[in-house]
A protein has these predicted regions:
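Conserved acid/base catalytic micro-environments in cytosolic active-site loops
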Residues: 1-187
């Protein structure tokens, strides 16, 4: 049974995240943690916009916060977000990974170690290589992996890089990702 969804996005990610979050039903009782490479001054505006489009609570993650259902956590600007063994969030200012902090790989890897087969990892649009290695780690630990179709993504580099590293479980258009999450969570 799926207990957590983790998502990574960069260039074009605001639109992509808005599309799939808006389609998640209130009945879906899971948490979502997102790393989005975004400018520091935009996160507050984004969170309030997304809160009006989804039935989930959308918020900036806090240190030692328990991961709770029906909540979407965003990594704060300039902090890596990590999943701890006790299923809480920790924040770190460790060195950048793939030129990024927050790093998608850091989130994906720590979530894979804790949630294993109870995890869905989703890599969306983006113009760097962050997220591919972490998504592979999710697959190695038995989690499900979804990559936005590089052919239709706003920026294809991140999803394409993942498909060259390994074979994700699903490569699908952004409009169909929420439906796939629902399907996997009800199996």
């Amino acid at each position: 049974m799926i207990k957590l969804v983790v998502v990574g996005a960069s260039s074009g990610g605001i639109e992509a995240i808005s599309i799939f979050l808006a389609k998640l039903p209130v009945s879906l009782n899971i948490p979502v943690i997102i790393v989005l490479h975004i400018g520091n001054n935009k996160i507050g505006t984004l969170l309030s916009q997304l809160n009006s489009k989804t039935s989930f609570l959308v918020k900036e993650a806090e240190e030692q916060e328990t991961i709770s259902p029906k909540t979407v956590y965003f990594a704060p600007p300039n902090y890596h977000i990590q999943v701890e063994d006790n299923r809480t969030i920790s924040l770190s200012t460790d060195a950048k990974v793939n030129f990024s902090r927050p790093s998608i790989d850091v989130l994906f890897e720590t979530a894979a170690w804790v949630y294993k087969y109870e995890l869905i990892g989703i890599l969306l649009t983006g113009s760097n290589n962050d997220g591919s290695k972490g998504l592979l780690e999710i697959k190695k630990h038995g989690g499900k992996t979804i990559v936005e179709n590089p052919k239709t993504a706003y920026s294809k580099t991140m999803p394409y890089t993942a498909t060259t590293l390994f074979e994700p479980d699903y490569i699908i258009n952004i409009e169909d990702i929420a439906e796939k999450i629902i399907e996997l969570c009800t199996e």
